[in-house]
Structures are given as structure tokens and as C-alpha cells.
Amino acid sequence: MKKQVRKKDEFQFNKERYYLMYKNIEKQTKLNLKDQVDYQPGQVVSKTLVQNEYVSMTIFSFDKGEEISTHAAGGDAMVTVLEGKGRFTVGGEVFFLEAGDTLIMPKDIPHAVYGEEQFKMQLVVSY
């Protein structure tokens, strides 16, 4: 089997694309993701940390009673609750998640998120 060799320029382009993908966050610093977004009365607040053609990572805060209405994503979505408690409806099934819990929401399946109380979550979508 013949080994595939990359051209130097192609490698440099890919290397830069992968290493320069974080934004809106301090690098080389110890931090806690839940501290990266604040609660706002009556709002859902988001802060995108990564966005490219392969993956997105966003931190959200939900005030109690706030929601993201039913929608579907173009990739598999993984949510991890960082603080508080939220309700997730995925394909008609309801899940209650609290700090430390993670849920995978499959691509193209309708889902919604509701703040049972104030809560924060990390969302990672892979395309």
C-alpha cells in the first residue's frame, strides 16, 4: 500500500485552522466554564467559544423559566449542565439534567431546552 504524503503547505494550512479555533476565552489560564457567562433576568445568554465547519462549542445561561424552543441541529449535539437544573425535550422524550449530567441529542431530531431554575450548560455540536 502506497503511503499518502501531504504537501508542506497543506499541512500548515490545516495546522493553523485547527489551532486557531478558540475565541472569546482566555488561553493558558485556569478557568471554570460556568464562570464564562452570566445570568441576565428574563434571558438566555450565550457565548460561543469555538465555531468552524466541524464543531461548535457554546456556553449558555438560562434564567428560570426561559427556553430555546423546539428546533433541530445539523449535527449531533452534546450538552453538559454546568450549574443548576434544566429540562430537555428530545424527540418527544423529556430529560431533567442537573450539574454534571450530559445528554447527546442526535442530528436532525427536534429538541428544546427549558430552565427549570437558573442553569448553565455547555453545548458541543459536531457536524
Language model region names:
Residues 107-127:
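Ligand-binding loop in jelly-roll beta-barrel domains
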Residues 50-52, 63, 73, 81, ...:
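A short, compositionally biased micro-patch
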